[in-house]
């Protein structure tokens, strides 16, 4: 295995990397760094967590040391990723007087303008704010020789493809080295490569380097109304160190977060309506172990680079393979093992098969935990917590109450009663989650008869106030209730599912 010095990295940077604990380059760093130092364009296919920031950042430091003015522009899909990349570049360049400035929305632009006037060598930013500075001419392009697009497919998914083209067109092609990194290569990214890159060197980390050995992928078949109970049972049994839970909508994220909090779990939610200040606060809590469950939409989770995530739960199945790849890529990083569990309604199995076919690997079926397994896991957790509590000094008033109780009750029975209350404390807490329709079957028409409202209540975890009352399966029941849905049906963009027998309404749209 080559070391960094053999790849052409200077002694000063090598010393810094070794002080950071980086003795040897990762596969993508080993393959990319020589080409980057030569000035070749690079097309890298790799997920976050494979060392790709070092793949472009380490050679970039070598190229900008001693230079004046903006030499390099790095585009990232989100503020968080931009800040993370900038921080890593500062670490790589310690003691070498390399200035790195971040520019992104949600922060005062005047402060960024002042920072740009100081002539940093490297600018890291989100596409929208970079264009703002280009239009204001506060970001000059004449000295830029290296353009890097990090997580290009994420930027495309967020609607930045035209912004990326605009920015690439602003930097003279004859002087520009372009490095583009992406976990997936959709058609729009391929077209971008053909239009703006010059015979790029293709660096691709193989699947077995990215996710296969590190992530155990499972699916569990569960009906919508039983999903939350099944999910919390998995949480109790798995006891994840850090978990990210994906919901399909903002409403789902809000309701899931509230439901988890009411059950005693330490959770916070992230979606597009969360303010930047709140978002940073939530991420800080997650990274500092103040919360251990992060509930997020796909958009809100894009660009997150959080180490130590042990579990990813797809509470709602993703609609495409690329989203699935990005979701589960949040765990199993840096050689650590991870677990990804996808909850799937029986009629959504076509989506599981599509993901398996595209990724060329099979997920394992996972049965929901039995009640005995859940209680055993809770008991073990309570036992550990009690041991921690016993190391604390108790307040005198509690000791007095304890003495009074021990006079009245047998000590073993007293402790057993308290433990039982702790183990089952949250079982009776009712939560409310809006019913979400399963995804339509792929390549076939979806009929309403496949979603009749004969699902069981799910231990009282869902609010069924809007559930249709039971009726016969005959035509008279359909006619009786059809008017109730006509108005909503007309609002649907495409042909709706027919209402046969006992079905659910489109609740709380």
UniProtKB/Swiss-Prot annotation:
Q: What class of enzyme is it?
A: hydrolase
The signal sequence is none
Annotated ranges, domain Helicase ATP-binding: 33-203
Renumbered to this chain, motif Q motif spans: 2-30
For the Helicase C-terminal domain, which residue ranges apply? 214-375
**Keywords, sorted A to Z:** ATP-binding, Cytoplasm, Helicase, Hydrolase, Nucleotide-binding, RNA-binding, Stress response
Q: Which CDD domains match?
A: DEADc, SF2_C_DEAD
Family per UniProt?
A: Belongs to the DEAD box helicase family. CshA subfamily.
Supply one GO molecular-function term.
ATP binding
Task: Give me the Gene Ontology terms describing cellular component.
Answer: cytosol; ribosome
What ranges does the record list as Basic residues composition bias?
A: 440-459, 467-482
What's the superkingdom here? Bacteria
In the record, biological process GO terms are: response to cold; RNA catabolic process
Stated role: DEAD-box RNA helicase possibly involved in RNA degradation. Unwinds dsRNA in both 5'- and 3'-directions, has RNA-dependent ATPase activity.
Q: List the subcellular locations.
A: Cytoplasm
Q: Does the keyword NADP apply?
A: no
List the residue ranges of the region (Disordered). Answer: 440-509
Where is composition skewed (Basic and acidic residues) in this entry?
A: 483-492
Please give the name of this protein: DEAD-box ATP-dependent RNA helicase CshA
Q: How does it assemble?
A: Oligomerizes, may be a member of the RNA degradosome.
> Any S-S bridges, and between which cysteines?
none
Its Enzyme Commission number? 3.6.4.13
Q: Where is this motif: DEAD box?
A: 150-153
- What's the gene? cshA
**What reaction does this catalyse?**
ATP + H2O = ADP + phosphate + H(+)
